[in-house]
Amino acid sequence: MAQVINTNSLSLLTQNNLNKSQSSLSSAIERLSSGLRINSAKDDAAGQAIANRFTSNIKGLTQASRNANDGISIAQTTEGALNEINNNLQRVRELSVQATNGTNSDSDLKSIQDEIQQRLEEIDRVSNQTQFNGVKVLSQDNQMKIQVGANDGETITIDLQKIDVKSLGLDGFNVNGPKEATVGDLKSSFKNVTGYDTYAAGADKYRVDINSGAVVTDAAAPDKVYVNAANGQLTTDDAENNTAVDLFKTTKSTAGTAEAKAIAGAIKGGKEGDTFDYKGVTFTIDTKTGDDGNGKVSTTINGEKVTLTVADIATGATDVNAATLQSSKNVYTSVVNGQFTFDDKTKNESAKLSDLEANNAVKGESKITVNGAEYTANATGDKITLAGKTMFIDKTASGVSTLINEDAAAAKKSTANPLASIDSALSKVDAVRSSLGAIQNRFDSAITNLGNTVTNLNSARSRIEDADYATEVSNMSKAQILQQAGTSVLAQANQVPQNVLSLLR
């Protein structure tokens, strides 16, 4: 090897190896501090891509497991509501068995049918109001897809069915034939129902609108009814006249009234600024014109100044008999409380049902209009008639409420085979509950499988991207030793060119 000083090959070789060990040491320290074998794509490009796909699957499957739990909750919510529907159906069946017994009176059958109707209405309420996160689960047929995988199409479908009285085939279910109609039935079963209740207070008769509660007289041309503000009596006047106060009138009085002479006498005998009382009112003498009694006095009523003017007393008159009196404002006495007011009338409030009752009004029959026909209801509202015949409420085959008279009702029979109808409804509810129970078990299985898959994927990803501390500690120790050795050897290599100097001596 030639002896040169410009290029130190041994030093360069040593530096290169030292850089390699430095890089190895940095990599080992980075992995040990992060716990990851792959901290960037350069560490393992293929491994990073594989681990990233594992991460996507793990996150997707973890969310899918939560979705499956939501699916279980939906099924449990629906099944719980169906359990209540089942309980109501069981009670309806029990009542139906009771109703088929020949020992029941008409009153017994009516009571049984009333409870059956309440149970059926509760079934409809449960159907309409049961929901999960805003989704009604029993009010319509619906298929709800639950994503239980990390990829498209990996779903489980929950079949939700409409379960209500109509879908169960119990619409119009009756063990006692058509039900005698009441006012409440008319209001709840039909739209745009109008009419009025009649009331009598002595010889006076009134109507109360069944919708607005407005009270009018019971006449061909009804008048609106009010409550007298003074005495609480019923009246058709919308206001009551307040009593004018003679002392305070804007029109000039005739000469020599008691009020005019009294005020004139006070002015004549006093001076400006003096006060005096008259009829319970305190006045102040504002102006005194001469010594004859002419002038002005004032008082304050309800925060406003009212001035009385005395005039027409001749100069030098020895008495005040010619005095006239005029007020700046008309003042009245309220019929309600007897206090001064500037209003000539007090408004009456519109009458309400409670006002009729306060005046001992007695309820009479009602007139109810449904679909253009006017029906008559008795005072208690539990009997509806038309042309002298009692009306019954019935339902058509399509479930639409209708009114029929007693003749048509007599020809109607109770629901045929009521127990078979209930059993059919129970079977349908059982089928839906069984389906929901099976879907819950399926979700449980899916959740278990998802958990196992996530565990295995985490293990696989760990083998790719997690650091092996035993290996990395060994690599770090090796790199540290190589660093120390390389540094020492580099010092020796840098001394090699010094040997050339011996040739120059």
Swiss-Prot record:
Any one GO molecular-function label of the UniProt entry: structural molecule activity
SUPFAM superfamilies per record: Phase 1 flagellin
Keywords: Bacterial flagellum, Secreted
GO cellular component: bacterial-type flagellum; extracellular region
Coiled coil: none
Presence of the UniProt keyword Amino-acid biosynthesis in the record: no
One Pfam family from the record: FliC-like_3rd
Subcellular location: Secreted; Bacterial flagellum
Keyword Oxidoreductase: no
Function summary: Flagellin is the subunit protein which polymerizes to form the filaments of bacterial flagella.
Similarity comment: family membership: Belongs to the bacterial flagellin family.
Remaining remarks: Individual Salmonella serotypes usually alternate between the production of 2 antigenic forms of flagella, termed phase 1 and phase 2, each specified by separate structural genes.
Protein name: Flagellin
Originating organism: Salmonella enteritidis
Classification lineage: Bacteria, Pseudomonadati, Pseudomonadota, Gammaproteobacteria, Enterobacterales
